[in-house]
Design a protein with these regions (language model features):
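An active-site-proximal "capping" alpha-helix that borders the catalytic cofactor pocket
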Residues: 378, 398-412, 511
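Post-HEXXH active-site segment of zinc metalloproteases
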Residues: 369-370, 381-405
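Active-site-adjacent "gating/activation" loops or surface patches in catalytic cores
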Residues: 169-186, 232-235, 288, 296-385
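A well-structured
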Residues: 1-291
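C-terminal substrate/ligand-recognition segments
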Residues: 499-516
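Short beta-alpha connecting loops at secondary-structure transitions
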Residues: 86, 90, 356-360, 387-396, ...
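Long, K/E/R/D-enriched contiguous segments that form extended
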Residues: 268, 272-310, 320, 355-356, ...
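Long, amphipathic alpha-helical stalk/connector segments used for oligomerization, subunit docking
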Residues: 413-498
């Protein structure tokens, strides 16, 4: 395969992210089921010999890698077209097969534990018994029946967003959910961003009843699941991310004690602009008025990739090779299309020795740093391809650190490059914007999620109750240093993030990993 032309928007192909077609996916799904049927039969009476049992372990690992890859394909297709209903059906089938696979793997694991100590300490058995090993999906059929349709409904709801707004030249343009969120995160046009924000909030207010129903259903399910297992609703999240309750409480307390210092990331940015306060859309938005474009080293795809490779060289020289491979093999899709879902992510394709990166083309300083995050995650996934399946499944709390590391290293690289230049304030804005997100917005969203779960135990919550909780969360993080007349409209925006994380199973790990990732200051 060949590298895309200079600064040409990278896009997935049928070879880079396989099975996007119905025929290809159906064939791979049949292959996965055939492997699982064989494993189920053999797991009933596992072989006693180490050689035969080792073959069975490797067979299960191959099936797990294929299952993970098929999940990634489902997400890739859904992200490419949020209105597509097929990925939800596909994902349901993959998860049902994955549940059967883990059931069969349990029988194989029991046989592995009966091997002599010296045999268990060798490959391929050692990985299955490692304290770092993570078992696959244990979701029940009831979970699949409830949660998957709710997740699909949320995707289809946001896919209907079409915001009509005048452009700079006076023509009316239509923005999808993905395009609107991109404007809010990366556009340096303050007027345009505020206009989109107002329409964005109005759209969610108009659909608030539907999203409230979704949130009530998801939160209600999580409480039911915890109660049925005889556990607190946070226990499963802590276990999945290998975080102890004591560590989580200590982290949140430390963030709370330093909240006033963290708020300086907002007040100092207001001072940079010569303003008394920041509008709510400026807290996580790009800077306006300092520079129309990104500084040298962050202009366009090629410059961003070059800077990121240089920045990561001291951490691991292999990162540059991964980035080159990702571009040459079309593992990155950064197209801007109205039907695309919002967000930026990277998932693994271990069965195909590849990764899938979904992002937007880096435009401006904020877009460049946003682009770095999924590439850091992708590098971590690719580095794990030599490991057995149980060791590839790192918890989100660990995976997120690799994304944050890539952003941090790029920030440090650009700080050295721009030191003493007229563009230094642009980077300073980026550093404080990111700190505002990590130290204020993410913890407040985590607090919001926990508060809503606690409130949901008392009954169904109204849309107004959700928005009131969102407004409290916004004021908890940044009320005083922002435009108070504007933060009252932030509730619907934060509720949007709450809806998205609710349907994807949010955990405390986002707060944890962002708080302990290396900081450039």
């Amino acid at each position: 395969m060949t590298r895309p032309a200079p600064n040409k928007t990278p896009a997935w192909t049928g070879r880079s992210v396989p099975l996007l077609s119905e025929e290809g996916f159906a064939e791979a799904l049949e292959r996965l089921e055939a492997k699982i049927v064989a494993l189920e039969a053999l797991a009933k009476t596992p072989p006693k010999g180490a050689a035969a049992l080792g073959d069975l372990v490797r067979m299960a690992d191959e099936a797990r890698d294929l299952g993970v890859s098929l999940r990634t394909v489902c997400r890739a297709r859904q992200s490419s077209n949020a209105a597509d209903t097929l990925p939800g059906t596909w994902l349901s089938s993959v998860k049902r097969l994955s549940f059967r696979l883990e059931e069969a793997s349990g029988g194989i694991l029991s046989a592995v534990r009966e091997l002599p100590d010296e045999v268990r300490a060798r490959a391929p058995f050692e990985a299955w018994l490692s304290p770092l090993a993570v078992r696959g999906s244990q979701s029940s059929s009831l979970f699949e029946a409830v949660m998957l349709p709710l997740g699909s409904q949320q995707s289809h709801l946001v896919a209907t967003m079409k915001l009509r707004i005048p452009s700079e030249d006076g023509h009316m343009i239509s923005l999808s959910y993905a395009q609107a969120t991109s404007v809010l995160k990366t556009s340096p046009d303050n007027r345009f961003r505020r206009s989109v924000f107002a329409l964005f909030n109005a759209w969610f207010a108009e659909h608030s009843a539907a999203f409230a129903d979704l949130l009530n259903a998801v939160r209600g399910w999580k409480l039911h699941e915890a109660h049925a297992a005889g556990r607190d609703f946070m226990t499963a999240a802590f276990e999945a991310d290998r975080i102890t309750p004591a560590a989580q409480l200590a982290m949140m307390k430390a963030l709370e004690l330093r909240r006033e210092n963290a708020r300086l990331t907002i007040t100092e940015r207001a001072r940079l602009l010569g303003e008394r306060q920041l509008h709510v859309t400026q807290i996580l938005g790009s800077v306006e008025g300092m520079h129309a474009s990104a500084p040298e080293g962050l202009n366009g795809l090629d410059e961003v990739c070059g800077s990121l490779s240089s920045a990561m060289a001291c951490t691991d020289p292999a990162f540059g090779r991964y980035l080159e491979e990702a571009l040459e093999n079309h593992w990155i899709d950064a197209r801007s299309m109205s039907q695309r879902a919002g967000g930026t992510w990277c998932e693994d394709l271990p069965a195909y020795n590849a990764t899938a990166v979904f992002s937007t083309l880096p435009s401006g300083t904020a877009g460049a740093f946003q682009f770095a995050h999924p590439l850091g995650v992708g590098f971590m996934h690719k580095a794990q391809h030599g490991e057995q399946a149980p060791l590839k499944r790192l918890p989100y709390s660990v995976i997120e650190i690799f994304g944050q590391l890539a952003v941090t290293m790029l920030e440090r690289h650009m700080a050295r490059k721009l030191e003493g230049s007229t563009e230094a304030d642009l980077l300073r804005w980026q550093l404080m914007r990111r700190a505002s997100n990590m130290l204020l917005m993410v913890p407040s969203r985590h607090k919001l999620l926990v508060d809503l779960l606690a409130a949901r135990r008392d009954g169904i919550l109204s849309a107004s109750r959700f928005n009131e909780a969102s407004r409290r969360g916004t004021h908890f993080s940044a009320a005083r240093p922002t435009d108070a007349t504007s933060t009252s409209g932030a509730g619907n925006l934060i509720s949007t993030a709450q809806t998205r994380s609710s349907t994807t199973g949010s955990t405390p790990s986002a707060t944890w990993s962002r708080s302990i990732s290396p900081r450039p200051f």
